[in-house]
Amino acid sequence: MPHLAELVAKAKAAVEGAQDIAALDLVRVEYLGKKGHLTLQMTSLRELPAEERPAAGAVINQAKQEIQEALNARKEKLESAVLNARLAAETIDVSLPGRRMENGGLHPVTRTIERIETFFGELGFSVESGPEIEDDYHNFDALNIPAHHPARADHDTFWFDATRLLRTQTSGVQIRTMQEQQPPIRIIVPGRVYRNDYDQTHTPMFHQMEGLIVDRDISFTNLKGTLHDFLRNFFEEDLQIRFRPSYFPFTEPSAEVDVMGKNGKWLEVLGCGMVHPNVLRNVGIDPEIYSGFAFGMGMERLTMLRYGVTDLRAFFENDLRFLKQFK
C-alpha cells in the first residue's frame, strides 16, 4: 500500500484546514466514514493473499489511528477557540461600580395595618378575615340594618344582584366569627371595603379595621380604656381624646371618637359602641349573659393623620416619589 502514507498526509492536511466543527466532521466522514478512504482500504484487504492480510490490516489500522488522533486534537482546539470567543464576548469589567440594590419599603397603609395588628395582638386579639363579595344578610341584616336603611341604597353600595354586593364594611366577618365561635371572642378584622364615593377624602375602595370583644361583664368603660390606650400608642403622644354620642345600627350606645389636632381642632378618627343586643341574638348569643363592644376605623384616614397627608388619593397613585418618603 504505497499510497497509504500519502492518504494519511492528505487527511492530516484536511484536518488542519478545517475551520469549524462542521467542516471537521466532513473530513472525518471522507476518510473514516462507512464509504471513506480508509474504510475502502480495509475492504480491499480481501484481494491480498491470506498471509499478507494481517500485516496490511495493521498498517491500515495504524493510519486510521493517526487520522483519528489528528481529528481529536483539532476538535479540541476548535472547541477551545469557540469557548474563548464566548468568554471574551461575556467579559465583565470588574473595575466598574456595582449596581445599587434598591430596597423596597412597605406602603404607608400597610405600615398602619401592621402597627395596629401588633398593638391589639399584644392584648390578645386574633386577626380574622372574610370574603369581599358578601351577601346582604352578613353585610346588613345580621347587623341590625333593615331593608329600608339608607346604607343599602344603590348609590352607596356596589351591588351585583339583589343579594350580592362588594362589602361596605368588614363587620360581616364579625358576624361569621360569632356564628362559628362561642364567647369569649376577641378579634380584629382588617380588609378592603367598597363604597360608591370618590373625592379628596373618599375612594371607592379603602381599608378598614374593625375590632370586637364579646364576653361577660364587658362595659363601655372597657371600650374607652382600650381605645384611649390604642390612640396614644398609635400617634405616640398623650393626645386629648373625646367620645361623642352617635348612632350606628349595630351598636347601642354608639360614639364617635375625636382627637385634638395640632391646629387646635377636633379630628374624627373612629366609630365605636356596645354591640347591639339584636346583633347578639342574630348569631345565637344571649345578650342577658354576654355583652361586647365593637369599633371601626379607616386605615387611610389614620395614615393621613399620622403622616400629615392631605389627599387620600395619593395612597393609590403608586407615585414612588410619594411612597419613598415612608421607608
From Swiss-Prot:
Its main location: cytoplasm. Pfam families: Phe_tRNA-synt_N, tRNA-synt_2d. InterPro entries: aa-tRNA-synth_II (IPR006195), aa-tRNA-synth_II/BPL/LPL (IPR045864), Phe-tRNA-synth_IIc_asu (IPR004529), Phe-tRNA_ligase_II_N (IPR004188), Phe_tRNA_ligase_alpha1_bac (IPR022911), Phenylalanyl-tRNA_Synthase (IPR002319), tRNA-bd_arm (IPR010978). It catalyses: tRNA(Phe) + L-phenylalanine + ATP = L-phenylalanyl-tRNA(Phe) + AMP + diphosphate + H(+). NCBIfam families: pheS. HAMAP family: Phe_tRNA_synth_alpha1. This is Phenylalanine--tRNA ligase alpha subunit.
